[in-house]
């Protein structure tokens, strides 16, 4: 497969035209996936593309399954869900320090596929097949060292738990979370898509359309955090292969727990790399990490706080 014309290529963007969904392709040139978020990897690879004067490569989405069939790839060792601002970015960065690990951190194309039902009519079974095929491209054995695969989803992908569990019935689910007061303050300071009404389809998050009409932005954010934690409770009632990780645990301890449940191991060299990396900011690797404690709990977070404490009783 080393001489395959699609080796190192990934589907990175989904668009629509009169013929239906179109898949845009990107050559990764054996670049390692070590950016905090995968859109950073895409920018890096597109820059290399422009230097090679490559043309835009587009195909019908249906080709995804056919082309993925013969790819040598790595099966997932764990799927990481998170409630935002809870240490998942740092954990994924620490995991990516090993050349044996492929870490896919919030891949835009995965989000395009999972939310495609809100834009295009598509059969659920076909969508699951497309998602599995897409993962195979991202999980290619491109250097020969890859043995483990970790998929860190976008925060709202926890609501696709049932679909992802259908695709990967035996893969451990990691549930990362944090005190809602701290998540709320962080998202107020630097908003994410999930914290702004209308950016993510309300029904995906479990809202009725009328439920969010007229909500103040602060109330909306508090409701989203409540929905996230309620979904975690649903998952742990439905699934027997999960790991709850609270942000208040040391990052290295969290990584060790993830490797244990995913039946992987840490080499002495990987541990050394992690001990160095953990001193720095997860999203800004060159910046030393520091954290300022905020004010006491807000009343609008009371329901989320109750759900948070209930989760703590399960760890």
Question: Predicted regions span which residues?
Answer:
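PAPS-dependent sulfotransferases, especially Golgi type II membrane carbohydrate sulfotransferases
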Residues: 1-69, 210-221, 225-315
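PAPS-dependent sulfotransferase catalytic domain
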Residues: 3-234, 249, ...
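Secondary-structure transition/capping residues
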Residues: 102, 145, 175, 194, ...
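A polyampholytic, Gly/Pro-enriched intrinsically disordered region
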Residues: 123-133, 193-206, 287-297
